[in-house]
């Protein structure tokens, strides 16, 4: 069951955005008929991406925006549509694709942490007292993260919104990324909330703006930044995506991240639709996460049908009414009325598969902590298999897709 779009945590509808070049206003000095394109170079090309990108943009009359050398070899450039078509025929070029917009899928121990049995695992030591931290690094590719939040352990940040990452820049002016980060790794102290992997080191990669929107080129730059640090980072969370779009460059970036041993976790989307047309949730290498409605933090379905944070009703321990579904979804996790950290040092309760995905990303962080960090594709995919095999089926799948995915379960101290 698997599907991409930033999933707006506030349950916005389908993120079906046309895959058309962004307007010329995206770059100063661009011609009126220019758009932004992502160019993927062939891996066997011997010339350095920087020099080849400069030469090609000059040859085809474009304006170079950013160069990528880690997640994939390529660059982003301002080009006319005619130049982009000619560039596709260059023997050193694998793909040329128009940039497109994407969006977010919109201390107490939160119900989601309780529902996946986090407090039952002594290795996680969730007690609100001694601030034991999980030795793992997770990249949150999102709206940024509140790096001064007292409940978060943010160790690095970069702003990639322009297609070029600027280190030590960018904060969360939306709230979505900070919420995701808290579910992954809020510190187990005596304030606020606690995450699945308490105290996990968060690498904040800002690719989305204050409205929760961004571009494929920003995501490409962000993933390139992460893969360059694959020796340190164990997990990527992508609570974002788009419906009906795709990107060869970003697909390659995800594959190369996996090949480097990084586990990539993606939200399924909030359109109550099949994930087969949602990118990157339909990518073969990612862990795609649907959302469960849990009203009481307990198994058994006895929590009623009234949602604490919404006007809708959704029966306890069932598929969330908004969640995408399908054969590309591997696992489900709590996503409705999740309480977590927020921008400006605050806390907030929101819903979406964006909130389900970081539960799984946090669990992946626990599985890869310390000396268990994978360094190969096989290692990253083994983590995905463990996440799935340790899940339980003590919930009701009423999505109608006929395939019941396991519910994340981290209670087993011999595995987590």
Residue locations for each model-derived region?
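Protease zymogen maturation seam
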Residues: 23-30, 52-67, 72, 88-137, ...
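Active-site core segment of subtilase-fold serine proteases
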Residues: 107-201, 218-221, 228-235, 239, ...
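Extracellular S/T/G-rich loop segment that most often corresponds to the catalytic His/Ser-adjacent loop
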Residues: 141-142, 262, 278-369
